[in-house]
């Protein structure tokens, strides 16, 4: 039994300290103040004095409460009463002294303290279901308290839990407070009607003292005992409820964990971040980072993801997804209703393609000179990129693109700008690699081909060879039963040019090309450039509708109002119909070749849509770059410094040329050397380009442009060299050479001589000396050697000595005898071969 102070005992029994000190003194226990402690022996003496002073009868009752199939609680209840006088109802009793209630409450409190002091009490896990069952059972047991008309029951039952049995050491939570109060009153009423002998009371006292030592409380739950004591103390000496003292409430967990995972529908937009995706799925960002890591992608919670990656994550985590329609504004603005308009026939749009030096440019020049009015022949703007040719049977629109690279980018953007491809093949050269590539591009775009066999005026021309080579590549001429027209032409003499144009018009009739001539205009950007005094200039091919001066247009991420329009002859015009190439001024910037051009009635919406497109491009670019960097992080780990980088600053005259060169240079990158275009633009090379080149150690390349005076002065000071080109193929070749110079040289072994061992001499001073005959090349003293036996290498090392007769020799040539001493090797035998080699550096090539 734990020690307790007089003040604590007075507080537990609700008595004044002075009154308690007097009562202790009457029992022979001398205490002077409330801070004095009561030993277990004194407490035992106090209990015996109180019990011996009572003229009472006792009764003990043991009940068992089952919670479920495995658990139960045994409760032992001892009740005491004293009959003051007889009444009509035998159940009614009165207390002998009010102090009995205090004594009983004191005993219960002491017993609770005993339980709390046990070191081996095991903490029992609370079981919510067991608590519910216990509450239901106690509610069934509890009945209304007996009331009589004449007297009140003033005696309080003294309750002691003798033993709590909990199988598997699983504890049970404390029962509800109200149910325990009712149960206590019910037990008391049962004790009133019980007649117990004095002898049995004495036996119960002994059992009580024995179990108070701690044996009966090994598996008791202190929380339950303290709550029972608190419930008893909440009644006063007359059985009424006290208002101030309240038993502590048992905290219950109100959240119920869902049995099944909630499936959510996640709306995914382009460039969604990891944190946004986690918030929409109601998970932590670290879980999504973990899923990405398992997919081989390293990411942070603030990183943007592309839609495909976000879809994989949502599906991996068991949710559904919907794609956000970010093109709602674009569809509402750009889609034009043309149901009330009629279609008319339009001129075909033709692109001339072919291998370099096959006469493509010469053929274009001849068509320009012969099919344009003589007075206007020299007035054609060379950079317009598109022009119209009028014939007796109709008009033809030619596209003068920078090459097949730009044509490929147009097809990739989905701009249906070309109707027919004229494939130029030199009769004296035949099919070349770029010819094959042009065929593949045309077939991929499903565009019909008209073959122009050029240079037939040369003596070595062989048109039949060209037909045979193209037939092997599935380009079958009509004369062989195919559907491809072949026309023999000469760009120098003009032979066959009229037949070529007639074949193009015939092919266009078969295609039945039509377009809308009314309504808002639609088209495609052929070329764009920046001109001094005019600003951004774009060459646009109108495909549908009627483009007028003053219209609000949107070209990719650029917008503006058409301030002026010029046709292919450089004349100002007010309107342009389908299949008409025009130059327009007034855009906010330079659009990319292949961007769609649309007319929008509301300038505010055009500006808003341009900003939206620009933002989407930036987000997509950032997401793609981060995906590429992070996906290659593990592969590049530990390989830093192995891959060389050639940094280039590219400036060109027109947007199409810059894009074509950029794509061609990026394709040159290999595992050892990478081409990195850190900046590109249109216009002259400026001082800012030179400053950037110095800071990043980059090469400055100009295509059909030159550096201004300020840039030249700065370049001389900083030692920056400019490289100017006007032919794309020369530029690519020089870049290849520069990349080859960055490659690490390759080490190769070259055998320079072989000596055959004819005889072996043993020397105590020099070891084994091989007498050899040089049968091939030359044997040098300083070069490494290999010893071969039966053409198998058995040793590799260096020469220790090389002698000719008795003199040292630096080298011995073929057909001469010599003595060779191999360093650190004495097992040279007759018939072996000594192979002499040298290691040389060989420059790598791409």
Swiss-Prot record:
<keyword id="KW-0547">Nucleotide-binding</keyword>
<dbReference type="Pfam" id="PF04760">
    <property type="entry name" value="IF2_N"/>
</dbReference>
<feature type="compositionally biased region" description="Basic residues">
    <location>
        <begin position="207"/>
        <end position="219"/>
    </location>
</feature>
<dbReference type="Pfam" id="PF00009">
    <property type="entry name" value="GTP_EFTU"/>
</dbReference>
<feature type="region of interest" description="G2">
    <location>
        <begin position="379"/>
        <end position="383"/>
    </location>
</feature>
<dbReference type="InterPro" id="IPR015760">
    <property type="entry name" value="TIF_IF2"/>
</dbReference>
<dbReference type="InterPro" id="IPR009000">
    <property type="entry name" value="Transl_B-barrel_sf"/>
</dbReference>
<dbReference type="InterPro" id="IPR023115">
    <property type="entry name" value="TIF_IF2_dom3"/>
</dbReference>
<dbReference type="InterPro" id="IPR036925">
    <property type="entry name" value="TIF_IF2_dom3_sf"/>
</dbReference>
<comment type="function">
    <text>One of the essential components for the initiation of protein synthesis. Protects formylmethionyl-tRNA from spontaneous hydrolysis and promotes its binding to the 30S ribosomal subunits. Also involved in the hydrolysis of GTP during the formation of the 70S ribosomal complex.</text>
</comment>
<dbReference type="Pfam" id="PF22042">
    <property type="entry name" value="EF-G_D2"/>
</dbReference>
<comment type="similarity">
    <text>Belongs to the TRAFAC class translation factor GTPase superfamily. Classic translation factor GTPase family. IF-2 subfamily.</text>
</comment>
<dbReference type="GO" id="GO:0003743">
    <property type="term" value="F:translation initiation factor activity"/>
</dbReference>
<feature type="binding site">
    <location>
        <begin position="454"/>
        <end position="457"/>
    </location>
    <ligand>
        <name>GTP</name>
    </ligand>
</feature>
<keyword id="KW-0963">Cytoplasm</keyword>
<dbReference type="Pfam" id="PF11987">
    <property type="entry name" value="IF-2"/>
</dbReference>
<feature type="region of interest" description="G1">
    <location>
        <begin position="354"/>
        <end position="361"/>
    </location>
</feature>
<dbReference type="InterPro" id="IPR000178">
    <property type="entry name" value="TF_IF2_bacterial-like"/>
</dbReference>
<dbReference type="GO" id="GO:0005829">
    <property type="term" value="C:cytosol"/>
</dbReference>
<feature type="region of interest" description="G4">
    <location>
        <begin position="454"/>
        <end position="457"/>
    </location>
</feature>
<protein>
    <recommendedName>
        <fullName>Translation initiation factor IF-2</fullName>
    </recommendedName>
</protein>
<dbReference type="InterPro" id="IPR027417">
    <property type="entry name" value="P-loop_NTPase"/>
</dbReference>
<dbReference type="InterPro" id="IPR006847">
    <property type="entry name" value="IF2_N"/>
</dbReference>
<dbReference type="InterPro" id="IPR000795">
    <property type="entry name" value="T_Tr_GTP-bd_dom"/>
</dbReference>
<feature type="region of interest" description="Disordered">
    <location>
        <begin position="198"/>
        <end position="219"/>
    </location>
</feature>
<feature type="region of interest" description="G3">
    <location>
        <begin position="400"/>
        <end position="403"/>
    </location>
</feature>
<dbReference type="InterPro" id="IPR053905">
    <property type="entry name" value="EF-G-like_DII"/>
</dbReference>
<dbReference type="InterPro" id="IPR005225">
    <property type="entry name" value="Small_GTP-bd"/>
</dbReference>
<dbReference type="GO" id="GO:0003924">
    <property type="term" value="F:GTPase activity"/>
</dbReference>
<keyword id="KW-0396">Initiation factor</keyword>
<feature type="domain" description="tr-type G">
    <location>
        <begin position="345"/>
        <end position="512"/>
    </location>
</feature>
<feature type="region of interest" description="G5">
    <location>
        <begin position="490"/>
        <end position="492"/>
    </location>
</feature>
<feature type="binding site">
    <location>
        <begin position="354"/>
        <end position="361"/>
    </location>
    <ligand>
        <name>GTP</name>
    </ligand>
</feature>
<dbReference type="InterPro" id="IPR009061">
    <property type="entry name" value="DNA-bd_dom_put_sf"/>
</dbReference>
<dbReference type="GO" id="GO:0005525">
    <property type="term" value="F:GTP binding"/>
</dbReference>
<feature type="binding site">
    <location>
        <begin position="400"/>
        <end position="404"/>
    </location>
    <ligand>
        <name>GTP</name>
    </ligand>
</feature>
<dbReference type="InterPro" id="IPR044145">
    <property type="entry name" value="IF2_II"/>
</dbReference>
<keyword id="KW-0648">Protein biosynthesis</keyword>
<keyword id="KW-0342">GTP-binding</keyword>
